[in-house]
Amino acid sequence: MTIDSGFNHITVLLDEAVEALALRADGCYLDGTFGRGGHSRLILSKLGPQGRLLGFDKDPQAIATGQALAAEDGRFVIVQRSFAELGAEVAARGLHGKVSGVLLDLGVSSPQLDDPERGFSFLNDGPLDMRMNPDQGVSAAEFIATAPVEEIARVFKEYGEERFAGRMARAVVERREKQPFTRTADLAEVLKVANPAWEKGKNPATRAFQGLRIHVNNELGDLEAGLEAALDALEVGGRLAVISFHSLEDRIVKLFMRKLVKGEADNLPRNLPVQHKVFEPKIKLIGKAQFASEAELKANPRSRSAVMRVAEKLR
């Protein structure tokens, strides 16, 4: 597979995210969402000869890019796995509790959105796929073809936050009984007609497509598992930086960090004898949530929804 697909990706919050990791020259770091390697390359430029960086991605095109980088720089290794599985990879490499920092840059990348053949976009017609790894799992077309109307509506509503989810799901099922969906443009058109109240400046298929993508790739489940695995992998004093792009992701990150700042006692039954340390925070927050600067927004409008939260492990 060619590495240069012709679709460019501008890394969001590049300097801010790498700075948030408080890099040590000899540290071991994880880039849980390698993508096209923007963050990884900057991290490597700041590491010394003893530093190490382990990258994760599900996307075969990202893996090809990562393999090329690994061939150039022996401090870097790329792994084709979801960051939700980083715990197993870290354990296999003897790095549990020894990682100095973890970076997660969530969501879909610009090359994935802009390449019609990946099936993520309602703007460019392509096969209705949406899988980060096209070799694994059920495609969006397969899900739409077989799921009950109630399940399609749930995905649109729960993951896409689409208020007309039921109406749009019924329109999808009515159309699939006549002709199956195989192309993104066909689905987008049906969703467009079924949506009675278009949001200004937003394509009426936007929320439903987001819901489908999140469901097909189990993005929220992976995020919850990945956050826990990242915290376990970190050494005391290690940093976790997470960039999210919509409210569902950010809510999970915010609640995860808030719970650990408070300590674990809130999650235990009342009157249960516990050791004092469970009342102590497991992490501390580093600064407030960060957003793209005006300069970055101007250069890359897609950064407008990005929010980064950073935490440091205390115990």
UniProtKB/Swiss-Prot annotation:
Q: InterPro entries annotated for this entry?
A: RsmH, SAM-dep_MeTrfase_MraW_recog, SAM-dependent_MTases_sf
Q: What does it catalyze?
A: cytidine(1402) in 16S rRNA + S-adenosyl-L-methionine = N(4)-methylcytidine(1402) in 16S rRNA + S-adenosyl-L-homocysteine + H(+)
* Lineage top rank: taxon: Bacteria
Residues that, per the record, bind S-adenosyl-L-methionine: 37-39, 57, 83, 105, 112
Which keywords belong to this entry? Cytoplasm, Methyltransferase, rRNA processing, S-adenosyl-L-methionine, Transferase
Question: What EC number(s) is this enzyme filed under?
Answer: 2.1.1.199
The alphabetized list of GO BP terms reads: rRNA base methylation
Q: Which GO terms describe its cellular component?
A: cytoplasm
- EC category name: transferase
- Signal peptide (residue range): none
Where is this chain's protein located in or outside the cell? Answer: Cytoplasm
Gene Ontology MF terms: rRNA (cytosine-N4-)-methyltransferase activity
- Tell me the function of this protein: Specifically methylates the N4 position of cytidine in position 1402 (C1402) of 16S rRNA.
Per the record, the similarity remark reads: Belongs to the methyltransferase superfamily. RsmH family.
Matching PANTHER family: 12S RRNA N4-METHYLCYTIDINE METHYLTRANSFERASE, S-ADENOSYL-METHYLTRANSFERASE MRAW
Give the matching NCBIfam families: 16S rRNA (cytosine(1402)-N(4))-methyltransferase RsmH
- What protein does this entry describe? Ribosomal RNA small subunit methyltransferase H
Species of the source: Pseudomonas putida (strain ATCC 47054 / DSM 6125 / CFBP 8728 / NCIMB 11950 / KT2440)
